[in-house]
Swiss-Prot record:
Cystine bridges: none
InterPro entries, alphabetized: PCMT (IPR000682), SAM-dependent_MTases_sf (IPR029063)
Keyword vocabulary terms for this entry: Cytoplasm, Methyltransferase, S-adenosyl-L-methionine, Transferase
SUPFAM superfamilies: S-adenosyl-L-methionine-dependent methyltransferases (SSF53335)
Designated name of the protein: Protein-L-isoaspartate O-methyltransferase
Catalytically driven reaction(s): [protein]-L-isoaspartate + S-adenosyl-L-methionine = [protein]-L-isoaspartate alpha-methyl ester + S-adenosyl-L-homocysteine
Length: 208
């Protein structure tokens, strides 16, 4: 049984068009309040983005669900996340696939996320402090790549690290941002625009 607050959020997400029950089950299973500061715990199950420090945010649950659904994951999917942040999106992915690779440019956030994931007994995640623009070449290719911050254009390195048939989901743009889905097929990249969004920028380089 899920709490009334969790059920209310799930009902809202279904009303917004989220159809993948496995994704919804993952959202219900991950305690979002563990990924926000105490001051925001009462708002943890509201369908809003919340600040996590360092100028970053934990994404709105709808956007987490939408982007995850667009990845078309199976348990065997090899997944790369760019922007570990709080670790919340990472935890959702870890409930859906056997292993997740995640890159974070801010070391303090990476450490906090690793601690949260460990406290929740989610050990099927590898995190790395590095430049998200470069992906994780040593672990490539990936069946799915998700980016939780917006570059002004799609990073070439991420496209080349997709396996055949793989899917990349990311926000793209500066003043005006759009969620894009990129599918690699036969040496070509098919790009679909999903909807208008608002994310923090994907900054190049790594930060100590």
């Amino acid at each position: 049984m899920v709490s009334r607050r969790v059920q209310a959020l799930l009902d809202q997400l279904r009303a917004q068009g989220i159809q993948d029950e496995q994704v919804l089950n993952a959202l219900a299973a991950v305690p979002r309040e563990k990924f926000v500061d105490e001051a925001f715990e009462q708002k943890a199950w509201d369908n809003i983005a919340l600040p996590i420090g360092q100028g970053q945010t934990i994404s709105q649950p709808y956007m987490v669900a939408r982007m995850t659904e667009l990845l078309e994951l199976t348990p065997q999917s090899r997944v790369l996340e760019i922007g570990t942040g709080s670790g919340y999106q990472t935890a959702i992915l870890a409930h859906l696939v056997q292993h997740v690779c995640s890159v974070e440019r801010i070391k303090g956030l990476q450490w906090q996320a690793r601690r949260r994931l460990k406290n929740l007994d989610l050990h099927n995640v590898s995190t790395r402090h590095g430049d998200g623009w470069q992906g994780w070449q040593a672990r490539a290719p990936f069946d799915a790549i998700i980016v939780t911050a917006a570059p002004p254009e799609i990073p070439t390195a991420l496209m080349t690290q997709l396996d055949e048939g793989g899917i990349l989901v990311l926000p793209v743009g500066e003043e005006h941002q759009y969620l894009k889905r990129v599918r690699r097929r036969g040496g070509e990249f098919i790009i679909d625009t999903v909807e208008a969004v608002r994310f923090v920028p994907l900054v190049k380089g790594e930060l100590a």
